[in-house]
Every structure is written in structure tokens, then in C-alpha cells.
Amino acid sequence: MKALRLRVGIGMFCAVFMCAQVSGQSSSLQKGEKLKSFRWPDGKKAAVSLSFDDARLSQVDNGLALFRKEGVKVTFFVQPSGVEKRLAGWKQAVADGHEVGNHSLTHPCTGNYEFSRHNALENYDLAMMARQLDEANKEIYKQLGVKPRTFAYPCGQKFVGRGTEVRSYVPLVANRFLAGRGYLDESANDPLVCDLAQAMGTGFDDLDFLQMKKIVDDAVQEGRWVIFVGHEIGERGYQTTDTQALEALCEYLKNPATGVWLSTVEEIASYIQKQREDTNPPASKK
């Protein structure tokens, strides 16, 4: 009798183990099929956008010539006050075909940062943040004749208020822009599931080319979209994207063997949105 119970017990264990194994294989298969269900254009394996924040002078003074030489289009997330300092240069950026996105009017961040102590998100409400977005759009249009379709969260921070009064302003961004971009996030974007209103941004200031290349190669393996985020463009240093590393990155991304679609945040976000609409068209109204 004991032997029979033992055999029954072993049999049940084996059955459960096999079911779990099959389930795991099925889950892995579904995951693989899911990854294959999204297609980047022209057989590309991943996508990359180069973006730069704050309308820093070096972006115009050093960046435009570099991008013109490389034949690369990037996204500049600007504040009107920064644009005003190099207005002719920013008009040239638009003429060169670069995207200009909104980076708020006055760059509010947490008051824990000394530079934003008097412009702290903790002291904002949603109405104040809405004005930041709308007024910046108006000023950018006056300056450059373009209406931004994308937004970058200052400091990558997405909340206003304190304690029980904290509110996310992601919905404000979603209602006004095609896409919103974060900063210092831990992953590239999965085009199947990412929330375009808070797409992940990957910092590449202070990195050398090999570090940048690894980020790209990882994205290629997973079919993802990397949105690089930089600030100054020049010699390697704090919050500076090194020009030599940037040139090498552009060359690598343009190489057909790399398998990457290099374009602006707006263009890639538009493609993702269209793919989703084509895959899941809205139900027709009766």
C-alpha cells in the first residue's frame, strides 16, 4: 500500500512538473511571438533617437555642424529662454530638419535641487503645470514657427504637489503631445507596450562610444527603441556628450549592418502609434 501511494505521489509530482514545464515553454513561446509581432520599417531590428535638452548653446555651436556632416536628424527639447540666446542658430536647426520639442517654460524640478529651489514641483499644482506646457508651446511657435509635438519632462520628474496632494502630470502631456520622454530611466522602450506619454529616456552624457554601443546592441537584441538624452555637446565632461563618441555613434547607427532605424522622437513615436492603430483599429460606431 505504501509503495502504491509512493508511486501515485511520484506520478502526480511528475505530472505537475511537466505541466509547469509546458506552461513555461508556452509562455516563452508567446513572448517570442509577441516580440516578433512588431515590425520596424525596412527590416530594421531596433530604433534609436538622439535627443538633447535645455537649448544649451553648445547644441547649436557644436552640434549642428556635426549632425550636418553626419546627415543625422535629432530632437532638441527646448525652453524659450534658451532659444532666445541663439535664435538664429535655432532657426537654422529647424531649417536643417531637426525636431524641436517642448521642455517646459521654466524647467520646474524638485526643490531638492538647489537650482530649482524657487521653482519646485512640490509647490506646483496641475493648473500651474498646464500653463508651463501651453505657454512654452506658444513661445516656441512665436520664435521658430513650429508647434512641438513631443515633450521632455524636466529632470525626468512627472509629479506636482506634496504628500496626499501629489498628482501626476502625465495626463496633461498625453492630452497635448504625441509623446513625452523621461530621463535616466533603466530600460529602452518596448514598442508593443511602452506608454508614449512617458517613454523612457537613456542618458548618454559622459559616456564613451563603447558604452553607447552596448546600449544600442542590447536594444537590437530585444527589438526596442532607445531615446538617448544629452545636454552639452563638446569635450567629455559633466552633462556633456563627447563629440568624438557622438560622431562614432552616428557612424555606427548609420551602418546598415547595425540594423537600426535612426530618427527623431516624433517620427518614431508616430510610427509606433500607427502600428498600434493598424493592429487594433478602433471599433466602428453603429
What are these regions (language model features)?
Residues 1-6:
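N-terminal secretory signal peptides that target proteins for export/translocation
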Residues 9-21:
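Bacterial N-terminal signal peptides
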Residues 47-51, 74-78, 99-102, 147-153, ...:
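Structural recognition of the beta-strand scaffold that forms the well-ordered cores
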Residues 26-60:
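Boundary/entry segment of secreted carbohydrate-active catalytic domains
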Residues 59-80, 279-282:
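A short alpha/beta connector and helix-capping loop motif
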Residues 62, 84-85, 109-213, 245:
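Catalytic domains of cell-wall/extracellular-matrix polysaccharide-remodeling enzymes
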Residues 29-42, 74, 82-85, 177-193, ...:
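C-terminal domain-boundary segment and adjacent tail
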Residues 64-71, 83-105, 142, 173-174, ...:
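Acidic (Asp/Glu)-rich catalytic clusters
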